[in-house]
Amino acid sequence: MRWQGRRESDNVEDRRNSSGGPSMGGPGFRLPSGKGGLILLIVVLVAGYYGVDLTGLMTGQPVSQQQSTRSISPNEDEAAKFTSVILATTEDTWGQQFEKMGKTYQQPKLVMYRGMTRTGCGAGQSIMGPFYCPADGTVYIDLSFYDDMKDKLGADGDFAQGYVIAHEVGHHVQKLLGIEPKVRQLQQNATQAEVNRLSVRMELQADCFAGVWGHSMQQQGVLETGDLEEALNAAQAIGDDRLQQQSQGRVVPDSFTHGTSQQRYSWFKRGFDSGDPAQCNTFGKSI
């Protein structure tokens, strides 16, 4: 991506040298040992990546809530600047899209942190991956997740990283359009299988919205050769079917909450090819 020199967002808060603080409360996270711990790590990491708050899984003995202060490396500075630029591009993209709808886009906040931080949805921890909190309209990210994408998920490249931010912003768009609260209401009295199916549709729509952002980047000449493949690879790398096969050796479709690799690929591509949020209605057609 040709992102250097572009506008940075004014909606970024940097907490990387701040303590989580005693007001966060609650227990810390202790990963179980053995295969169960590995499975839980993958589940929480990927759920956080797609905006699902799994803080309730964080049980065990309390851990220190104090983050040590250390210097920020040049690579981390570069990642922070990149993240701020990407957020700014989503602001421009959705500002234009909402104007076409006759609406005003309310920009989300983004918080960069290390380890753990307070959020409107409870304690945020880096083990959760990036996530969006609808209660405070904020995207949270520990920038070390970019390394996790490369080393643990096999999804490398700046456009793949931008896709992460654009997906979380997609959840913010769902909130503004009234989609997220309606889905949460439907899930309250639904069976677990139906809760999961609704979650899949939410996540695929956020993928499609990320594709709409990607289309805007292409139209502006920001993308370089290979960028689209980076994002599509990221979408495929974290499909429920692939992750379940890797972590437990079998696939359980009724337990899917994010969609298959092919579904993620297809819905991102739909948004990317059309540039039209109206093409992202995952609730009105077969997925």
Swiss-Prot record:
Which Pfam families does the UniProt record give?
Zn_peptidase
Main subcellular location: membrane
Q: Where is the composition biased (Basic and acidic residues)?
A: 1-17
Q: What superkingdom does the record give?
A: Bacteria
Where does it reside?
Membrane
State the UniProt keywords alphabetically. Membrane, Transmembrane, Transmembrane helix
Stretches the record annotates as Disordered: 1-29
GO CC, alphabetical:
membrane
Entry-linked PANTHER family: INNER MEMBRANE PROTEIN (PTHR30168:SF0), PUTATIVE MEMBRANE PROTEIN YPFJ (PTHR30168)
Q: What name does the UniProt record give this protein?
A: Uncharacterized protein YpfJ
Q: Which organism is it from?
A: Escherichia coli (strain K12)
